[in-house]
């Protein structure tokens, strides 16, 4: 093990993660249909505070994220403060780092703690793929602005006469990268081809993810960290994630056709994470503040790293890039880890990152490092399943993973955990946490 270099405040306090909670995750247009992300965020933060029994005034900052932005609530963090009975003077702002958004929120609160500007804060994220900002065409948008400035009815009618039927069609949110036009699934297909990842390997990983997630729920391991959601019309609560296939079989995966490269592809709906609704949050404090309040932390944030690469080819390599940095900053190696939790955007992306973490050539020629980061031990990897099974509300996934990893570390008597994810725009994130 390398030299221990924990993150600490100016007074020498470690950054404590006191507690974490999430809503159940629901597939698009199912249990949370019609519930906007801001309401999901209020739901989880309100329940987190109630369960922790921490007075709301103790929380000095709330940093929250949302990837699918809603124009009517651009600062979701502030709306959560105002909608949960927190002190109105609580500092609150919103962040977005695509699928690594709650990693960023946690890092921001940690930096405030290290700077000494706060002693306690909440970080998290929420997203709804069921309540989307449906837009209008560029031509209609321009005409509507001009109509608003027109002074006479004849001027307004003349402007409207320029429109065609196609200009009136609603425009859904983009599912492709702004800079390249590539969908995430297209990038996953690139990675499968680049790194020789077969359809069978992808399906096997997806099957493993569902099996382990189903077992985690069956064993009661997730009850403490997932709240029961009561949603309109309040006829039936949602207590568990509804995407997990408890009866998953490999034969079922083989029946599906490729979703992106229809002719030669291997990426399917079943070996990809689905569009999902949900929210997750964690409470962070300085270690001394937690002791003052009589709280036993779940664990501590030891290090973190964010990286960025080119977006045109194999851009979902965030874990392979950010992991060695986070481990180096933590003074650890892969062999020191008790658990590894990697975001499963796609099975192809996950397997490619696993491959590169153990690649001497990638370390030497691409990262400029003397040795590979290290082989991923399957017995430590995504032991409770991953995003393919649980689902992926973009801004909430990081907080889910960190809370889940810390609870599992405590069940195992403590140790170090790596939590890592890829993100749109060629971004990557990794955090090392520890539990005692």
Swiss-Prot record:
Catalytic activity reported: an acyl-CoA + acetyl-CoA = a 3-oxoacyl-CoA + CoA
Keywords: Acyltransferase, Cytoplasm, Fatty acid metabolism, Lipid degradation, Lipid metabolism, Transferase
InterPro entries named among the record's database cross-references: Ac-CoA_C-AcTrfase_FadI, Thiolase, Thiolase-like, Thiolase_acyl_enz_int_AS, Thiolase_AS, Thiolase_C, Thiolase_CS, Thiolase_N
Single GO term (MF): acetyl-CoA C-acyltransferase activity
GO biological process, one term: fatty acid beta-oxidation
EC top class named in words: transferase
Active-site residue list: 99, 392, 422
Protein family according to the UniProt entry: Belongs to the thiolase-like superfamily. Thiolase family.
Protein name, entry field: 3-ketoacyl-CoA thiolase
């Amino acid at each position: 093990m390398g030299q221990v270099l924990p993150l600490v405040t100016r007074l020498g306090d470690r950054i404590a993660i006191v507690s974490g909670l999430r809503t159940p995750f629901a597939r698009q247009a199912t249990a949370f249909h019609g519930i906007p992300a801001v309401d999901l965020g209020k739901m989880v933060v309100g329940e987190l505070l109630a369960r922790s029994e921490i007075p709301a005034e103790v929380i000095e900052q709330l940093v929250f994220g949302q990837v699918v932005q809603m124009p009517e609530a651009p600062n979701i963090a502030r709306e959560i403060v105002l909608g949960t009975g927190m002190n109105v003077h609580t500092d609150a702002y919103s962040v977005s780092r695509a699928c690594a958004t709650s990693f960023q929120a946690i890092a921001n609160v940690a930096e405030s703690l290290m700077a000494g500007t706060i002693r306690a804060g909440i970080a998290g994220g929420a997203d709804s793929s069921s309540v989307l900002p449906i837009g209008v065409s560029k031509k209609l948008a321009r005409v509507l602005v001009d109509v608003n400035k027109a002074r006479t009815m004849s001027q307004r009618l003349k402007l409207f006469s320029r429109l065609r039927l196609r200009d009136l069609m609603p425009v859904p949110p983009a599912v492709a990268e702004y800079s390249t036009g590539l969908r995430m699934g297209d990038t996953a297909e690139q990675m499968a081809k680049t790194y020789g990842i077969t359809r069978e390997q992808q399906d096997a990983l997806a099957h493993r993810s569902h099996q382990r997630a189903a077992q985690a729920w069956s064993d009661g391991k997730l009850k403490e960290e997932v709240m029961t959601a009561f949603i309109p019309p309040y006829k039936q609560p949602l207590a568990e994630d509804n995407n997990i296939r408890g009866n998953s079989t490999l034969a079922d995966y083989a029946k599906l056709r490729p979703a992106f490269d229809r002719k030669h592809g291997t990426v399917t709906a079943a070996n990809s994470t689905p569009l999902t609704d949900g929210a997750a949050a964690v409470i962070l404090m300085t270690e001394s503040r937690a002791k003052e309040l009589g709280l036993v932390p779940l664990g501590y944030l030891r290090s973190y790293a964010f990286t960025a690469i080119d977006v045109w080819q194999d851009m979902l390599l965030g874990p392979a890039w950010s992991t060695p940095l986070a481990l180096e900053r933590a003074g650890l190696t892969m062999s020191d880890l008790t658990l590894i939790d990697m975001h499963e955007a796609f099975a192809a992306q996950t397997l490619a990152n696993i491959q590169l973490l153990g690649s001497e050539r990638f370390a030497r020629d691409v990262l400029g490092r003397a040795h590979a980061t290290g082989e991923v031990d399957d017995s430590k990897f995504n032991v409770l399943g991953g995003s393919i099974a649980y689902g992926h509300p973009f801004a909430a996934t990081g907080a889910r993973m960190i809370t889940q990893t810390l609870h599992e570390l405590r069940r195992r008597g403590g140790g170090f955990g790596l939590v890592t994810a890829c993100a749109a725009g060629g971004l990557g994130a990794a955090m090392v946490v520890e539990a005692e």
